[in-house]
UniProtKB/Swiss-Prot annotation:
Entry keyword annotation includes Transmembrane helix: yes
Protein's UniProt name: Glutamate receptor ionotropic, NMDA 2B
PTM entry text: Phosphorylated on tyrosine residues. Phosphorylation at Ser-1303 by DAPK1 enhances synaptic NMDA receptor channel activity.
Residues annotated as transmembrane: 558-576, 631-646, 818-837
Domain commentary: The extracellular N-terminal domain (ATD/NTD) endows NMDARs with a unique capacity for allosteric modulation, harboring several binding sites for small molecule ligands that act as subunit-specific allosteric modulators of ion channel activity. A hydrophobic region that gives rise to the prediction of a transmembrane span does not cross the membrane, but is part of a discontinuously helical region that dips into the membrane and is probably part of the pore and of the selectivity filter.
Region called Pore-forming, residue ranges: 604-623
C-alpha cells in the first residue's frame, strides 16, 4: 500500500505540471512570431470580403505572421475612435492599425495622426476621410495614407491642362492646410516648363467670415480664364460653386479642376457641383477596399519581417496608451524606416517622408450630365492617359446658347495638313503648330490603354483655320480622322471627314477637301480658298545625249554663217587687202621681180583666221598690210565672242536630256487604251476621293483598269513613280504641284506644268444649316482681300523645284556625253582614209593622163589645176613658157630637154662650190645621164646614178654622150614617184638656183629616201669599180624608183632653210632688204636692224645667200683633183640608190668630235699629193686584198685615222662617236645587217648633253703633239699629202671650239678674227641688200690673201685644210647661238648638208665606210687601207673641206670611225634627242 501512496504524492503532480509547461514553451518557440494588426472599418463596409482577404494564406513566405483583429465601428467622432484603439492595444496587444471609413471627413485623418504620434503605433488610412490630404503631420507620427500628396495632385492637374492645351488658367483656394503647397507647386512647375503657361489670377477665399456672399462674388468676378483650379474641402467647394454659379463661372466655356479632397466620396455628389467638373481622385475602380486592406496588412507585416531578419526582434506590443517607454520609442523609430520602403509581390508600396504613397493609383474623373462621376483618364507611372481626344463640353440641359468652342476634324495631307510629333523635351507642340489628337483604333485595346495619341498639326489649312478662328472668335479642338479619308458614301453611310460632320461628331472639317455636288447635299461648304482640280504626275526618265550635242550651242544657221564669213568673206578680204597692199608679201611681184617669192595666199588667210577662232597655237603667217591687219583684228574680236559664247552654252547641251511622258488629258490614248502600248501604261489614284469619283462617273473603263494600280496614299504613289512601278499618278492638282516642287532631285513633274482637268476648289465643310457658314465665308474672302492668302500660298504651296533653279551638280562627263565628238573624229578618220586611198590611186594610176602624158598634150584638168595652184600659192605662170616648163613637155619634148640640158650645163659651169663642195661645177659633169628638176624649173643638175662625179681624164670631151643619155633617160622615164616632178622642200618660194635642195647635197642627207627608205644591203665582197658594163645597163629606168627628197621636206614655204624654229616668235636682225641703197646707208645701224619673225623671212633671201656661199672660189692655186675611173664612180653612185631588201635605215650620227690627229694627218698627207691623173693606177686589184680591194692613196676625207684604229673597228662593233665597244651587237648581226651598224652609237653618246650643254662640244681633246709617223707598207704608193708646220699650228689655233651664247648687243663689239668665205661673184643688187655696219655687211668681202676661183689644181685636202685651219680663212667656230660669233659670219648661210639635223650644236653627216674583213695589217697607217677602197673618191666633190669630220664612205657595211678616242662620259640628264636651233636661245633659257 505504501508505494502506491508515493506515486500519488503532490511532488509527482508538480513534476508533471513543469514538464507540461516546458513542452508547451518548446512548441511555442518552434512556431513563427506574430504581430497583432487591427483592421478598423467605420460604416457599412463589406466585412465578409475583408475577412476573406486577410484569411488567405498570402503571408506564409514572411518570417512574421500577421494576427489580424477585425473591428467594426459606427461612430466617427474623435472620442470613440481614440477609445476603441486604446482598448485594442491593452486587450489584444496590437502593434499596428489599418483604418478605413466611408466618410468625407478629413478630421478623421487628423485624429489618427494624433493617436499614432502619441502611441508610436503605425496606422494606415486606406479609405475615406482617413486617406484624405493632410498637410501638416506630427514629426513623431507613424500615420501613412493611401492617397496622393498635394504636389502629386497639382502635377496631374497641370498635365490634364497640357493634354488639351489649356494654357490659360486661374487658381482659387481657401485657407485649408496645404493650400500654400498647392500654389507653390503650380508656380514652380509653370516657371520651369517649356509650355507657354499663363496664370492669370490666384484667388484666396476666406470662408471664416460671415459677411454673406458679396465678398466671394466680387473676388470670383475677377476670373476671366476658361480653366480654374480649386483647392479646398468638399464643404467649402459646395459653397464656392454656389457663388460661382451665380456669377456665371460654372456655365459652358468654363472648366473647373479640383483635387481628391474636393471630390471626396464619389457616391455622393453635391448638387452645387457643376457638370463637367474634373477631379483627380484615388482609384476606386481598380483598387477597391479589399485590395487596400490586404496591402495595408502586408505593409506592416513585411516591415516587421524585415526588421526581424536584420535585428532579430520586432516591436513589443503596447499595453496602454498612456505610458511610453524609451525602449518603445527606439523600436518604433526602427520600424518606421522599414515601413517607408516596402515592396510586396513586385509592387512598390513605399511611402514618402510625409506619409503619402510614392506611386499612388490615380484616376481622372468627370462629372457627366447624369451627375455621376465618370472615369475619363488615368495617371500611372507619371504618365497621363485620357479617354477623350477632344474634351467633351458639358453644360446643363437648360442652357441653349450656341457653343463657341468647336470640335474640328482634319486629314493629314501635305502641304495642307502636316502632322508632327510633340516636342520630346516639353511634351507639347511647338510654336506655329496646333495640338491635334489622333485616335487609336485597335481591337485588342484595353481600358488602361489610351484611346488617342497627341500630335501637332501645321500646314496651309491649319494657318487658314487659325486666322478664321481669330477673326470669327471661336475656339476649337482638332483631331485627325481615322475612318477613311476625305469622305465617301458607302452603303448609304458617309465615312471620312464628311462622315464626322454628318454624324455631328465634328462641327467642321478642314483640309484638302474637294467641293463636289454629292458632298454638298449633306454638308455646307464655304467659299473655296484654293483652286484645284485633277492633274497627272509622271517621273522624269534619263535620256541620252544627242551625238550632235556639241554643235547645239549654235544653230545650223550660225555655223553656216561662221564658215561663210571665215572662208568667203573674211579670208578673201584679208587675202585681197594683203595682195594689193604696197607693203604686203607680194610687193616683189609689183616691183617686177622674178615671180615665186613669198606670198600671202588664200590658204594662209583661212589658216590664220581658223587659228584665231579656236585659239590654236599653230604657226601662221601674219599679214603686213595695214588694211589686212585691221581686218584680222576685227576677226579676232569676233573670235573671242564666238568662242566664249560657245563655251558658255556647251555644258548645258552636254547634260543628258530627260524624257517625260506627255499626256494631253484624261481622254488621252494612254489612259483610255493603255494596253495598246508596250509595256502597258500603268496609272492609278488614291481611292475614296473626289478624283476617283470623277473618273468613275466619266470614264468607267478607265476606272476599272486603274483599280489594280490604286495607291494607299500620296507618299506610296510617289515612291511607286520613282521606282518604276507606276507610270502616272492622277490626283488633286494642288497636292501634286506641291509634291513636284518639293521632290528631292526634282524627278517628279506634273504634265503641262501643272495642267488641271475638271477644275474645282478646296473648301471647309460645315454642319448643315449652321450659323457659322456666313461668318467663315466672310473671313475667307477677307484673307483674299488682304493678300494674306497669297502669302500663305507662297509659303506652303511653292516648292524649290518651282521657285528656284536647280543647282547644277558637278559630275564627270561619261562616254554618252561626249559620244558626238568621238563620232565626228571617227568620221574624220574614215574620210581621211578614203581621201588617202583616192590620193594614192590618182597619184600612181590616173594623174599622168590628167596631166596630158597619155595624150601628149596638156589636159584641161591639168591647166585648171595649175591655175588654181598659181592662185593659191602666188606663183605666176607665164603663157609663153607654160608648155616649155611643164612636166609634160619635159617628158615628151626631146628638143626642149636638150635645150634645158645645155642651159643647165652652162649654169653649172659658171658656179663653183656646188652643194658646198670646193670643186668647180665642171668637175661634176660626166658622161652619165642627168635629171633636170622639171618640177620647179630651177636648173638644178643631178646625176642619174646619184653619185658625185670623179674627174675624167684630162683629154676626155666635157659633154661626151650627153645627147644620147638625155634621150635615153627621158624617153624611158616611168612616172611612179611624185618626187621626180616636185621638190618637196623648195616647193615654190626658192629661186631657181643650183644650190637648191634638189642638188647633190640632198643625196647625203640622213633623212633622204635613198639612204633611209631603201638602204643597200651590202654583200661581204666590196664593190669593184672595174665591173663589167652589163652590170650598169639595167639602170636606165632608175629615176622612177627613187626620190630625191623624202616627205619630211615636203614643201611649205614656211619651212625656212635655216636652223631656226618656224614657230618661234623671237626675232633675228636683218638689214633692210628694199628701198634705195643710198638712203639705207644713211640710216643708223639700229634703225636698219628690222625685227620680224623667222617664219616671215623671204625664202629668196636665204637662197641667194646660200647661192653666194656655194659660189666661193678655191682657197689656193694649188688646188688639185683626183680622178678615178668614170665607170667605177658611176657604179658607186648607182649603188647608193639600188633598192635592196632587209637593208636597215640610216641613223643620225653625231660627228661633233674632232681629233687633234685629224688635222695633223691631213697636213702630212697633203705634202705628197698626186696629180690629177695619177690615182688611176690605184684602182687595180692588189694581190693581198682578199676581197679585191686595191691599195691606193687614201681619199682626202680618210685622212685622220691610223691603220690600227681602222683594224680595231673593222672587225667589231664600236661606237660611232667614241671608242667604246658595243657588246650588245654580235658579229652575226654585223654580217647580216652591216649597213645598220655603220652609224651605231653607244648609250653614252645617245644620251650625251642637250642643246644648252656648253661643255658637251668642249669635250674634244686638245693634243699639242702631232701624230707619230707610221710605217708604210712597201706596196703602198709613195704619194703623200703635203703638210707644213705652219699649217699644223694654224689648225690648232682655229680648231672648232664652241662659243657661249652671244646676245645681239655684243655683235658689234666682236672683233674680226677670220675672213668670211667670199663668193666668186656677187651682183651689185644682191650686195646692196646688206647694210654697212650690220653683222653681215662684210659677208661678201674677200679676206686678204684669199685665193680666187682661178686655180683648179689645188687638192681637195689642202682646200679642206684651209677651210678650217687657216687663220685667215673663213672657218666657222661652232656656236649654239643663232647670232654669229663675228660680224662677218652669217649664221644663215647653208653649209654642206644644211638639210641635215643638228645634234648638240654641230651638224651630223652620214657617210659610210665599207667593212674590210681580213684586210692586210702590214701598214699601220689607215691611209693604206682606205686607198684600197673603190669608192674612196665617191664624195670627192660633195664633202667640203671646211668640215674636218670623220665620214662613212658610201653605203657600205663597216662601222664608222669616231673622232674621239676616249669614251664619252654618260650624261644622265640628257635625252639624246636631235635638236634644231631656236631663233634665240638667250631669250628662251
Amino acid at each position: 500500500m505504501k508505494p502506491r501512496a508515493e506515486c500519488c504524492s503532490p511532488k509527482f503532480w508538480l513534476v508533471l505540471a513543469v514538464l507540461a509547461v516546458s513542452g508547451s514553451r518548446a512548441r511555442s518557440q518552434k512556431s513563427p512570431p506574430s504581430i497583432g494588426i487591427a483592421v478598423i472599418l467605420v460604416g457599412t463596409s463589406d466585412e465578409v470580403a475583408i475577412k476573406d482577404a486577410h484569411e488567405k494564406d498570402d503571408f506564409h513566405h514572411l518570417s512574421v505572421v500577421p494576427r489580424v483583429e477585425l473591428v467594426a465601428m459606427n461612430e466617427t467622432d474623435p472620442k470613440s475612435i481614440i477609445t476603441r484603439i486604446c482598448d485594442l492595444m491593452s486587450d489584444r496587444k496590437i502593434q499596428g492599425v489599418v483604418f478605413a471609413d466611408d466618410t468625407d471627413q478629413e478630421a478623421i485623418a487628423q485624429i489618427l495622426d494624433f493617436i499614432s504620434a502619441q502611441t508610436l503605433t503605425p496606422i494606415l488610412g486606406i479609405h475615406g476621410g482617413s486617406s484624405m490630404i493632410m498637410a501638416d503631420k506630427d514629426e513623431s507620427s507613424m500615420f501613412f495614407q493611401f492617397g496622393p500628396s498635394i504636389e502629386q495632385q497639382a502635377s496631374v492637374m497641370l498635365n490634364i491642362m497640357e493634354e488639351y492645351d489649356w494654357y490659360i488658367f486661374s487658381i482659387v483656394t481657401t485657407y485649408f492646410p496645404g493650400y500654400q503647397d498647392f500654389v507653390n507647386k503650380i508656380r514652380s512647375t509653370i516657371e520651369n516648363s517649356f509650355v507657354g503657361w499663363e496664370l492669370e489670377e490666384v484667388l484666396l477665399l476666406d470662408m471664416s467670415l460671415d459677411d454673406g456672399d458679396s465678398k466671394i462674388q466680387n473676388q470670383l468676378k475677377k476670373l476671366q480664364s476658361p480653366i480654374i483650379l480649386l483647392y479646398c474641402t468638399k464643404e467649402e467647394a459646395t459653397y464656392i460653386f454656389e457663388v460661382a454659379n451665380s456669377v456665371g463661372l460654372t456655365g459652358y466655356g468654363y472648366t473647373w479642376i479640383v483635387p481628391s479632397l474636393v471630390a471626396g466620396d464619389t457616391d455622393t455628389v453635391p448638387s452645387e457641383f457643376p457638370t463637367g467638373l474634373i477631379s483627380v481622385s484615388y482609384d476606386e475602380w481598380d483598387y477597391g477596399l479589399p485590395a487596400r486592406v490586404r496591402d495595408g496588412i502586408a505593409i506592416i507585416t513585411t516591415a516587421a519581417s524585415d526588421m526581424l531578419s536584420e535585428h532579430s526582434f520586432i516591436p513589443e506590443p503596447k499595453s496602454s496608451c498612456y505610458n511610453t517607454h524609451e525602449k518603445r520609442i527606439y523600436q518604433s523609430n526602427m520600424l518606421n524606416r522599414y515601413l517607408i520602403n516596402v515592396t510586396f509581390e513586385g509592387r512598390n508600396l513605399s511611402f514618402s517622408e510625409d506619409g503619402y504613397q510614392m506611386h499612388p493609383k490615380l484616376v481622372i474623373i468627370l462629372l457627366n450630365k447624369e451627375r455621376k462621376w465618370e472615369r475619363v483618364g488615368k495617371w500611372k507611372d507619371k504618365s497621363l492617359q485620357m479617354k477623350y481626344y477632344v474634351w467633351p463640353r458639358m453644360c446643363p440641359e437648360t442652357e441653349e446658347q450656341e457653343d463657341d468652342h468647336l470640335s474640328i476634324v482634319t486629314l493629314e495631307e501635305a502641304p495642307f495638313v502636316i502632322v508632327e510629333s510633340v516636342d520630346p523635351l516639353s511634351g507639347t507642340c511647338m510654336r506655329n503648330t496646333v495640338p491635334c489628337q489622333k485616335r487609336i483604333v485597335s481591337e485588342n485595346k484595353t481600358d488602361e490603354e489610351p484611346g488617342y495619341i497627341k500630335k501637332c498639326c501645321k500646314g496651309f489649312c491649319i494657318d487658314i483655320l487659325k486666322k478664321i478662328s481669330k477673326s470669327v472668335k471661336f475656339t476649337y479642338d482638332l483631331y485627325l480622322v481615322t475612318n477613311g479619308k476625305h469622305g465617301k458614301k458607302i452603303n448609304g453611310t458617309w465615312n471620312g471627314m464628311i462622315g464626322e460632320v454628318v454624324m455631328k461628331r465634328a462641327y467642321m472639317a478642314v483640309g484638302s477637301l474637294t467641293i463636289n455636288e454629292e458632298r454638298s447635299e449633306v454638308v455646307d461648304f464655304s467659299v473655296p480658298f484654293i483652286e484645284t482640280g485633277i492633274s497627272v504626275m509622271v517621273s522624269r526618265s534619263n535620256g541620252t545625249v544627242s551625238p550632235s550635242a556639241f554643235l547645239e550651242p549654235f544653230s545650223a544657221d550660225v555655223w553656216v554663217m561662221m564658215f561663210v564669213m571665215l572662208l568667203i568673206v573674211s579670208a578673201v578680204a584679208v587675202f585681197v587687202f594683203e595682195y594689193f597692199s604696197p607693203v604686203g608679201y607680194n610687193r616683189c611681184l609689183a616691183d617686177g621681180r622674178e615671180p615665186g617669192g613669198p606670198s600671202f595666199t588664200i590658204g594662209k588667210a583661212i589658216w590664220l583666221l581658223w587659228g584665231l577662232v579656236f585659239n590654236n597655237s599653230v604657226p601662221v603667217q601674219n599679214p603686213k598690210g595695214t588694211t589686212s591687219k585691221i581686218m584680222v583684228s576685227v576677226w579676232a574680236f569676233f573670235a573671242v565672242i564666238f568662242l566664249a559664247s560657245y563655251t558658255a552654252n556647251l555644258a548645258a547641251f552636254m547634260i543628258q536630256e530627260e524624257y517625260v511622258d506627255q499626256v494631253s488629258g484624261l481622254s488621252d490614248k494612254k489612259f483610255q487604251r493603255p494596253n495598246d502600248f508596250s509595256p502597258p501604261f500603268r496609272f492609278g489614284t488614291v481611292p475614296n476621293g473626289s478624283t476617283e469619283r470623277n473618273i468613275r462617273n466619266n470614264y468607267a473603263e478607265m476606272h476599272a483598269y486603274m483599280g489594280k494600280f490604286n495607291q494607299r496614299g500620296v507618299d506610296d504613289a510617289l515612291l511607286s513613280l520613282k521606282t518604276g512601278k507606276l507610270d502616272a499618278f492622277i490626283y488633286d492638282a494642288a497636292v501634286l504641284n506641291y509634291m513636284a516642287g518639293r521632290d528631292e532631285g526634282c524627278k517628279l513633274v506634273t504634265i503641262g506644268s501643272g495642267k488641271v482637268f475638271a477644275s474645282t476648289g478646296y473648301g471647309i465643310a460645315i454642319q448643315k444649316d449652321s450659323g457659322w457658314k456666313r461668318q467663315v465665308d466672310l473671313a475667307i474672302l477677307q484673307l483674299f482681300g488682304d493678300g494674306e492668302m497669297e502669302e500663305l500660298e507662297a509659303l506652303w504651296l511653292t516648292g524649290i523645284c518651282h521657285n528656284e533653279k536647280n543647282e547644277v551638280m558637278s559630275s564627270q562627263l561619261d562616254i554618252d556625253n561626249m559620244a558626238g565628238v568621238f563620232y565626228m573624229l571617227g568620221a574624220a578618220m574614215a574620210l581621211s582614209l578614203i581621201t588617202f586611198i583616192c590620193e594614192h590611186l590618182f597619184y600612181w594610176q590616173f594623174r599622168h593622163c590628167f596631166m596630158g602624158v597619155c595624150s601628149g598634150k596638156p589636159g584641161m584638168v591639168f591647166s585648171i589645176s595649175r591655175g588654181i595652184y598659181s592662185c593659191i600659192h602666188g606663183v605666176a605662170i607665164e603663157e609663153r613658157q607654160s608648155v616649155m616648163n611643164s612636166p609634160t613637155a619635159t617628158m615628151n619634148n626631146t628638143h626642149s630637154n636638150i635645150l634645158r640640158l645645155l642651159r643647165t650645163a652652162k649654169n653649172m659651169a659658171n658656179l663653183s662650190g656646188v652643194n658646198g663642195s670646193p670643186q668647180s661645177a665642171l668637175d661634176f659633169i660626166r658622161r652619165e645621164s642627168s635629171v633636170y628638176d622639171i618640177s620647179e624649173h630651177r636648173r638644178s643638175f643631178t646625176h642619174s646614178d646619184c653619185k658625185s662625179y670623179n674627174n675624167p681624164p684630162c683629154e676626155e670631151n666635157l659633154f661626151s654622150d650627153y645627147i644620147s643619155e638625155v634621150e635615153r633617160t627621158f624617153g624611158n622615164l616611168q612616172l611612179k614617184d611624185s618626187n621626180v616632178y616636185q621638190d618637196h622642200y623648195h616647193h615654190h618660194h626658192r629661186p631657181h638656183s643650183i644650190g637648191s635642195a634638189s642638188s647633190i647635197d640632198g643625196l647625203y642627207d640622213c633623212d633622204n629616201p635613198p639612204f633611209t627608205t631603201q638602204p643597200r644591203s651590202i654583200s661581204k665582197k666590196p664593190l669593184d669599180l672595174g665591173l663589167p658594163s652589163s652590170k650598169h645597163s639595167q639602170l636606165s629606168d632608175l629615176y622612177g624608183k627613187f626620190s630625191f627628197k623624202s616627205d619630211r621636206y615636203s614643201g611649205h614655204d614656211d619651212l625656212i632653210r635655216s636652223d631656226v624654229s618656224d614657230i618661234s616668235t623671237h626675232t633675228v636682225t636683218y638689214g633692210n632688204i628694199e628701198g634705195n641703197a643710198a638712203k639705207r646707208r644713211k640710216q643708223q645701224y639700229k634703225d636698219s636692224l628690222k625685227k620680224r619673225p623667222a617664219s616671215a623671212k623671204s625664202r629668196r633671201e636665204f637662197d641667194e645667200i646660200e647661192l653666194a656661199y656655194r659660189r666661193r672660189p678655191p682657197r689656193s692655186p694649188d688646188h688639185k683633183r683626183y680622178f678615178r675611173d668614170k665607170e667605177g664612180l658611176r657604179d658607186f653612185y648607182l649603188d647608193q640608190f639600188r633598192t635592196k631588201e632587209n637593208s636597215p635605215h640610216w641613223e643620225h650620227v653625231d660627228l661633233t668630235d674632232i681629233y687633234k690627229e685629224q688635222s695633223d694627218d691631213f697636213k702630212r698627207d697633203s705634202v705628197s699629193g698626186g696629180g690629177p691623173c695619177t690615182n688611176r693606177s690605184h684602182l687595180k686589184h692588189g694581190a693581198g686584198d682578199k676581197h679585191g680591194v686595191v691599195s691606193g692613196v687614201p681619199a682626202p676625207w680618210e685622212k685622220n685615222l691610223s691603220n690600227v684604229d681602222w683594224e680595231d673597228r673593222s672587225g667589231g662593233n664600236f661606237c660611232r662617236s667614241c671608242p667604246s665597244k658595243l657588246h650588245n651587237y654580235s658579229t652575226a648581226v654585223t654580217g647580216q645587217n652591216s649597213g645598220r651598224q655603220a652609224c651605231i652609237r653607244c648609250e653614252a653618246c645617245k644620251k650625251a648633253g642637250n642643246l644648252y650643254d656648253i661643255s658637251e662640244d668642249n669635250s674634244l681633246q686638245e693634243l699639242d703633239q702631232p701624230a707619230a709617223p707610221v710605217a708604210v707598207p712597201s706596196n703602198a704608193p709613195s704619194t703623200k699629202y703635203p703638210q707644213s708646220p705652219t699649217n699644223s699650228k694654224a689648225q690648232k689655233k682655229t680648231r672648232n671650239k664652241l662659243r657661249r651664247q652671244h646676245s645681239y648687243d655684243t655683235f658689234v663689239d666682236l672683233q674680226k678674227e677670220e675672213a668670211a668665205l667670199a663668193p666668186r661673184s656677187v651682183s651689185l643688187k644682191d650686195k646692196g641688200r646688206f647694210l654697212d655696219g650690220s653683222p653681215y655687211a662684210h659677208m661678201f668681202e674677200t679676206p686678204a690673201g684669199e685665193s680666187t676661183f682661178a686655180n683648179h689644181e689645188s687638192s681637195v685636202a689642202a682646200a679642206g685644210h684651209r677651210h678650217h685651219n687657216n687663220p685667215g680663212g673663213g672657218g666657222y667656230m661652232l656656236s649654239k647661238s643663232l647670232y654669229p660669233d663675228r660680224v662677218t659670219q652669217n649664221p644663215f648661210i647653208p653649209t654642206f648638208g644644211d638639210d641635215q639635223c643638228l645634234l648638240h650644236g654641230s651638224k651630223s653627216y652620214f657617210f659610210r665606210q665599207p667593212t674590210v674583213a681580213g684586210a692586210p695589217k702590214a701598214r699601220p697607217d689607215f691611209r693604206a687601207l682606205v686607198t684600197n677602197k673603190p669608192v674612196v673618191s665617191a664624195l670627192h666633190g660633195a664633202v667640203p673641206g671646211r668640215f674636218q669630220k670623220d665620214i662613212c664612205i658610201g653605203n657600205q657595211s663597216n662601222p664608222c670611225v669616231p673622232n674621239n678616242k676616249n669614251p664619252r662620259a654618260f650624261n644622265g640628264s640628257s635625252n639624246g634627242h636631235v635638236y634644231e636651233k631656236l631663233s634665240s636661245i638667250e631669250s628662251d633659257v
